[in-house]
Amino acid sequence: MDRDLVERARRGDQEAFAELVHQVSDTLYGVARRILRDPGLAEDVLQNALVTIWRKLPGLREPDSFEGWAFRILVRACYADAPRNRRWTTTVRVLPVDRASDEDGLTAISDRDELERAFRGLPLDQRAVFVLHHHVGLSLVEVAEVLGIPDGTARSRLFYATRALRSAFDAGRDRPALQEGQLA
């Protein structure tokens, strides 16, 4: 991240802020979408986070920490705006099984759907750690710093998220295959 660009944005330069947003918005949106699992909600949360970033930017003490600081604001916005007791919708698919050549493809779809359901079932704090570590590529120390939590907490959240995903994936492999006309 260009330190000069962050400094200019901190001083109220709207063009500099627009350039910062251009540089980080795709990554921030990807994080929000992966945490929330809802593209529309992710867009709304991103917009709210960008407004907060603009308002709080003059108070940013260290321009080199802009990205981590922006991630922190975004994740907090995800926590605040996520529907607390929402029941996640399930994707409905009709899966053909009469063709042997489709078997591997069906298994891949089934595996992906199992992981998606399991991921949606994770608490938001575990999803945030998982996404920041595995999708953004932050180290666990960086994840802890971004989220403002101890390193050990980041490690345990990642451990429990990974364990839950692995259990759900393994449980899905024990289910019988769906026949054509059945709903996934």
Would you name each region that the model predicts?
Residues 2, 80, 88-112, 139, ...:
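Internal acidic/polar
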Residues 6-30, 127:
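A short, charge-rich alpha-helical start-of-domain segment used by transcription regulators
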Residues 10-11, 34-37, 50-65, 84-88:
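Sigma70-family region 2
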Residues 21-39, 56, 119, 171:
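Amphipathic, Lys/Arg- and hydrophobic-enriched alpha-helical face
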Residues 30, 44-51, 55, 64-76:
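Structural recognition of an alpha-helix C-terminal capping motif at a helix-to-coil junction
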Residues 55-62, 72-93, 108, 160, ...:
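Arg/Lys-rich amphipathic alpha helix in sigma70-family domain 2
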Residues 68, 75-79, 126, 141, ...:
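DNA-recognition helix of helix-turn-helix
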Residues 129-133:
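A short pre-motif secondary-structure segment
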